[in-house]
């Protein structure tokens, strides 16, 4: 609303005089105080036939009313995920209108890509390294906040986004983009924001169902706007091996990504501050590899092969898997490599040693007379983790590959990807945490989107994730004690293509949209959300389109 202030030492008379003067001027100018109508005669100090000394003394003219604008306190920007803290202020906020542009502060040249992207999204010019002018958005590195944190300040018609690293500044630009998309503006005030968890993402199985590079790139763009930073790529399984290989081209499926396509995906991911985590699962889930190398297939004492399982008693088995781990460690620049370790079929029978005597003999030879098949499998995990560690990666593995009570213990440096408590070898999550292990949450109760809904899986809903799940809920619906929160590194939503024909790629993209959005909210800020689910869903539609 507009408020007019009348200035002067005598507010009462001045107000009255001003009101009269305005009324007079308005009446004589067709109702416009600054109109061009003919002015009425007014005392002018002297007039013909009148003594100056007899003229009435005129009061000093009252100042022209000066319009000023007052603003209510701003409210937090409406974004997904919600910002964690907003200091309200009075002011008009910011809109992307001329002469606004995007500039990068001195000593922040590394933010050029972020600046160009934001400028294009907002439809304003990118001016590069330049001093911020009226209406500009300035990106700057600096400060001592946590990794991926940022501060976004709207003041004096400008926006300034700062952070200790490029990722944090990038997330600030996502907040600005969403606020403008949803309401046309960014509210006045200061946003201070940072993620609750360092690993936040999506996992996609392209081994069972091929997805194109373009489809994957679209998911990366969606993830970036949700401030998600990790994309798990499961590209090897019984049904297919989906990335070209130089070391073993014989194992590659007809439908696959070329290395040029993978590099394009990786370049986009890097520009969006997303790490792509490759996964080659072993010693199970290797059917595509074994079709080209049947001599390495695990067979029981009767000679019956086990689907997807490699015979880990054979040195050639380790050689081929290690060849692949080294090849793709070089292709993928990120800091993690997922080595699988789940559902090894040799461990699902009543007596692994009796059914697979070659594995039992190899275990005793390598780890001593008390060792069994479980120990050989655990040693396999440690050996594969050592290969990717030598390439500069942190190994990840599924939780049912970490066994209790054996001669061999899984390396403490391997991150536990907790997905289920239902498989043989799986333990309650508190056991892993009590051992001091770090865990990433992929709870199949909430975060598994399994095509065709086999084995009693149902498609997860965003509402259920939003209302019931937190990173502490690792298994089923029960959270682990809050004291373990620092060991839980984050979470990913996972797409598995068990019945590949059940949905088209477009249906998958649509089906995971709201569950992934809900996950993004809960890993950015694990506290109880302030919006109801219906409010959140409406907001997500507004800011994401």
Question: Model-found features: residue ranges?
Answer:
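Flexible, acidic glycine-rich loops studded with aromatic residues
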Residues: 395-400, 407-545
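Active-site beta-loop-alpha junctions enriched in small/polar residues
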Residues: 207, 236-240, 279-285, 342-344, ...
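Active-site neighborhood of glycoside hydrolase catalytic domains
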Residues: 307-415, 419, 424-431, 435
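Acidic, contiguous N-terminal accessory segments
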Residues: 3-11, 15-17, 21, 29-37, ...
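Signal peptide processing junction and immediate N-terminal pro/mature segment
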Residues: 28-50, 54
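Structural preference for beta-strand elements that scaffold enzyme active sites
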Residues: 199-203, 230-232, 273-277, 336-338, ...
């Amino acid at each position: 609303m507009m408020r007019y202030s009348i200035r002067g030492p005598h507010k009462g008379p001045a107000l009255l005089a001003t009101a009269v003067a305005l009324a007079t001027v308005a009446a004589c100018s067709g109702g416009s105080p600054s109109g061009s109508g003919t002015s009425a005669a007014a005392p002018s100090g002297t007039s013909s036939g009148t003594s100056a000394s007899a003229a009435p003394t005129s009061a000093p003219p009252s100042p022209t009313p000066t319009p000023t604008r007052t603003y209510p306190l701003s409210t937090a920007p409406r974004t997904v995920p919600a910002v964690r803290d907003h200091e309200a202020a009075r002011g008009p906020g910011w809109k992307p209108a001329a002469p606004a542009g995007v500039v990068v502060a001195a000593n922040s040249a590394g933010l050029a890509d972020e600046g160009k992207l934001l400028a294009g999204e907002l439809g304003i010019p990118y001016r590069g390294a330049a001093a911020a002018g009226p209406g500009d958005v300035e990106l700057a590195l600096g400060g001592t906040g946590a990794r991926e944190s940022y501060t976004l300040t709207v003041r004096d018609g400008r926006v300034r986004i700062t952070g200790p690293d490029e990722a944090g500044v990038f997330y600030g630009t996502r907040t600005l983009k969403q606020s403008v998309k949803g309401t046309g503006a960014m509210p006045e005030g200061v946003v201070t924001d940072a993620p609750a968890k360092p690993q936040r993402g999506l996992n996609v199985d392209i081994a069972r169902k091929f997805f194109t590079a373009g489809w994957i790139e679209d998911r990366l763009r969606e993830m970036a706007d949700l401030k998600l930073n990790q994309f798990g790529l499961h590209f090897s399984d019984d049904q297919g091996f989906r990335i070209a290989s130089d070391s073993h081209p014989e194992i590659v499926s007809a439908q696959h990504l070329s290395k040029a396509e993978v590099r394009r995906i990786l370049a986009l991911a890097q520009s969006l501050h997303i790490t792509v985590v490759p996964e080659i699962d072993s010693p199970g889930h290797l059917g595509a590899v074994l079709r080209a190398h049947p001599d390495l297939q695990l067979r029981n004492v009767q000679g019956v092969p086990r689907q997807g399982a490699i015979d880990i008693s054979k040195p050639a088995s380790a050689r081929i898997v290690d060849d692949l781990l080294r090849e793709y460690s070089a292709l993928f620049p990120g800091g993690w490599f997922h080595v699988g370790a789940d559902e090894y079929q040799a461990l699902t029978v009543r007596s692994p040693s009796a059914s697979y005597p070659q594995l039992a003999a190899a275990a005793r030879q390598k780890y001593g007379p008390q060792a069994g098949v479980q120990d050989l499998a655990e040693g396999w995990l440690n050996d594969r983790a050592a290969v990717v560690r030598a390439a500069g990666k942190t190994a990840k593995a599924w939780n049912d590959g970490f066994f209790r009570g054996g001669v061999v213990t899984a390396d403490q440096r391997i991150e536990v990807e907790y997905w289920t408590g239902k498989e043989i070898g799986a333990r309650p999550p508190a056991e892993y945490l009590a051992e001091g292990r770090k865990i990433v949450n992929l709870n199949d109760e909430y975060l598994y989107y399994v095509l065709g809904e086999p084995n009693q899986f149902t498609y997860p809903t965003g509402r259920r994730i939003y209302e019931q799940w937190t990173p502490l809920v690792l298994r089923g619906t029960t959270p682990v004690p809050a004291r373990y929160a620092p060991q839980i590194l984050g979470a990913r939503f996972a797409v598995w293509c068990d019945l590949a024909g059940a949905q088209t790629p477009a249906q998958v993209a649509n089906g995971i949209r709201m569950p992934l959005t809900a996950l993004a909210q809960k890993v950015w800020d694990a506290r109880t959300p302030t919006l109801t689910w219906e409010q959140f869903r409406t907001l997500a539609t507004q800011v994401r389109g």
